[in-house]
Every structure is written in C-alpha cells, then in structure tokens.
UniProtKB/Swiss-Prot annotation:
GO terms for molecular function: aminomethyltransferase activity; transaminase activity. It catalyses: N(6)-[(R)-S(8)-aminomethyldihydrolipoyl]-L-lysyl-[protein] + (6S)-5,6,7,8-tetrahydrofolate = N(6)-[(R)-dihydrolipoyl]-L-lysyl-[protein] + (6R)-5,10-methylene-5,6,7,8-tetrahydrofolate + NH4(+). One of its GO terms (cellular component) is mitochondrion. Its EC number is 2.1.2.10. InterPro entries: GCS_T, GCST_C, GCV_T_N, GcvT/YgfZ/DmdA, GcvT/YgfZ_C, TrmE/GcvT_dom1. The keyword Transit peptide applies. It is found in: Mitochondrion. Keywords: Aminotransferase, Mitochondrion, Transferase, Transit peptide. It comes from Gallus gallus. This is Aminomethyltransferase, mitochondrial. Substrate binds at residues 221, 250, 388. The keyword Phosphoprotein does not apply. SUPFAM superfamilies: Aminomethyltransferase beta-barrel domain (SSF101790), Folate-binding domain (SSF103025).
Length: 392
C-alpha cells in the first residue's frame, strides 16, 4: 500500500501524461539495466523506483547511502563583474555575503512577492556564480534570467549567462562521507553543509561537489561532465553501501525532512512568509528592500500572513493533495499540498496551508479523504531529525 500510494501520488502530482519527446539523462541505460521503472518527470525520463521497491530504498537511504539521478536540474553559470548585482535583482538572498565556495538556498520572486522558483546559488572559488534550478521551472527561469541580464547589459552592466552541459548525481545518506572520501583528493571533513568545491571524483575530473541534498541526510550533489556520468555512477554503485534510488524515495525523504516541492508546496501563489521560508531573506536585503516583491513580502512580515505552511500527521488513509483541511466547526481552513505514508515513522505525514489561527503545532484539525473526515494533528517540521554536516 505504501509503495503503490507513493507511485500514484507521483503520477498525479508531477508526471506528464505522454512519454513522447522526453529527454534522457546520461544514466538512462544504467537505470534500465538495474531494473529502474522509468516514468516521465518534468519533461525527462527518470526512474521512479527499482526492484527492491520504494520502502526499502527509502529506509536504505536513511541507514546507509543512495545514488539519485538529478541530471534534469538546470545548472547555470553567471559570469561578469556585475554577477552579484544581477542575481540580487532577482532573488531574496544575500549573495554578496557568500564566501568563495559557499552556497545558499534562495528564492526567485516576482513583483507580487510570489515564489517563481527555489534555487541553490554558490559563489564559486573561480570567477562565477553557480545556480541550480528546478527542472520544471527551467524554461521560465532561463527566460527571467536572460531578460534581466539583457537589461543590465543594455545599461552598461557586465553579466553573462552560460547554461552548463554538466549532469548531476546526488549521493545521500549517513555512509556518504565514507564512500565518497575514497574517491576524493580533498578532505571531505572540510566541506561542510552548503559549501562547494571543484575537484576530481573517482578519477573523473571537472566535477563540482556541493554538500547539500533533498533528503535531510548528510549528502552531496555532484556536477559531472555528461560524457563521464556513467563512469562515475558505476564507480559509486560499485560500493556495497550505495543503492540506486528513484523519484518515489526522493519524494518521501524530502517530505519527512519538511522540504518544499516546487509546484506543490510553493509556487507563484505563495510568498516566502506564508511558506515559512523567511530565513531565506538576507538581513541586508530586508533593510534595503531591493528584491522583487519586497514591499509586499515585508508588509507580510510586519502584519503576519493570513495563512501558513504547516506539517500534519495522521493515521488511517494517506493525506493527499488537494484534500481539504477543516477546522473545529467543520469549515474549510486550508488545503493539503504534499502527503504520503512515512516509511520512517509508520504513520501519515503531509504538509499544507491553513489559516494562521489554526497553524499552531498541537492543533487538531480534520482532513477530508474520499468524502470521509479524518483527524490530523498540526506537527512541527521536520518530521524526522535532519543530519546535515554543519560547520562547528
């Protein structure tokens, strides 16, 4: 039931309806050879799970280590002396304060204060910023960035964008450091959460290793030359600790960690304040109010939002979007945006938006599932402890 439920949820929420014209990652043949069940996702063909199933894959990642194909993510390099000014004209984060090799999660916003995408931006030790965007937002993000870059250049600014041909793999789980250190010339203990380095990985040069991920575990994402991606993946999967993992495990892992999925939990109808992502707003940026939608966002900070993103736990049938969340009087107070049975906890977890008056952890609400009402408890996120390798 768990595995079938997660597969069905992925199909409903993220997958396109037809396989024609799908892009393939360099690891496509490897996935198929290892029993990956391929599905369409954001215009790409990607594995949803492997023969061992979603439950085993999820738990293996929590206990050991898994390899995820994230080649569908858009990777962009931003060059030029005005690259920081360019990016800060689009996002809410303090890019200027990033040290060489340091990155941050930030939000691309519009003039209404809505979230256009969530990005990871790294100030590389080289001469550029490295930006990773969601695959489903790739065309939109490119148009926004290229449009703004053209405006800056027309005004005499120096900025240039280069879409990277590199692909990417995520290595996630408590065994990651042991596995990866064997193939790195660098001391991995010096690479803390949200820092990045250009290096060679298991003999493959031209890689970028960033200590981050989408599971709540210690992990890295490796940007690798497309022509060497299979070689690197095979080296990693040659380690007994490393299993291949698919979209189903990635989704349940990120939900347990309380991480947002763009298009479900955040989109162009939500603001950073409503989403509980106020921490992404740099202190200097709040004062300067020089990012898109700043007036609206800072007004919400002052007056408090009318709705908030919350976590929910329940027993019984899984809570799936767009299930209605009901208050004590049986009136609608919100909507579920993500949900699945938690392999780690053995109960249902979900996130959604509710009226602010009903957002306090410990509040009992009701969720309507197949025309029946089931109790759900507002629960603090993350649902399971995270294990990021933080700087001491």
């Amino acid at each position: 039931m768990l595995r079938a439920g997660c597969r069905a949820a992925l199909a409903r929420r993220h997958l396109s309806s037809a396989p024609e014209g799908l892009k393939q990652t360099p690891l496509d043949a490897l996935h198929r050879a290892r029993g990956g069940r391929m599905v369409p996702f954001a215009g790409w063909s990607l594995p949803v799970q492997y023969g061992r199933g979603h439950l085993e894959s999820h738990l293996h990642t929590r206990r050991h280590c898994s390899l995820f194909d994230v080649s569908h993510m858009l990777q962009t390099r931003v060059y030029g002396r005005d690259r920081v000014r360019f990016l800060e004209s689009l996002v809410v984060g303090d890019i200027a304060e990033l040290r060489p090799g340091q990155g941050t999660l930030t939000l691309l916003t519009n003039e209404r204060g809505d979230i256009v995408d969530d990005l990871i931006v790294t100030n590389t030790a080289e001469d550029h910023l490295y930006v990773v965007s969601n695959a489903g937002c790739a065309d939109k993000d490119r148009a926004v960035m290229e449009g703004r870059a053209a405006e800056l250049r027309a005004a005499g600014g120096d900025v240039h964008l280069e879409v990277s041909g590199q692909r990417a793999a995520g290595v996630q789980g408590p065994s990651m450091a042991q596995v990866l250190q064997a193939g790195l010339p660098d001391d991995l203990t010096k690479l803390t959460f949200m820092t990045s380095t250009a290096t060679t990985v298991f003999g493959v040069p031209g890689c970028r290793v960033t200590r981050c991920g989408y599971t709540g575990e210690d992990g890295v994402e490796i940007s690798v030359p497309a022509g060497r991606a299979v070689e690197l993946a095979e080296r990693l999967l040659g380690c007994p600790e490393v299993w291949p993992a698919g979209l189903a495990a990635r989704d349940s892992l990120r939900l347990e960690a309380g991480l947002c999925l763009y298009g479900n939990d955040i989109d162009e109808s939500t603001t950073p304040v409503e989403a509980g992502l106020l921490w992404t707003l740099g202190k200097r940026r709040r004062t300067a109010m020089d990012f898109p939608g700043a007036a609206i966002i800072m007004e919400q900070v002052k007056e408090k939002p009318k709705r908030k993103r919350v976590g929910l736990t329940s027993v019984g049938p899984p809570l799936r979007p767009p299930a209605a969340i009901l208050g004590p009087e049986g009136t609608p107070v919100g909507t579920v945006t993500s949900g699945c049975p938690s392999p780690s906890l053995g109960k249902n977890i979900a996130m959604g938006y509710v009226q602010a008056a009903h957002s306090r952890p410990g509040t009992t609400l009701t969720v309507e599932v197949r025309k029946k009402q089931h109790p759900a408890l507002v629960t603090k996120m993350p649902f399971v402890p995270t294990h990021y390798y933080m700087a001491k």
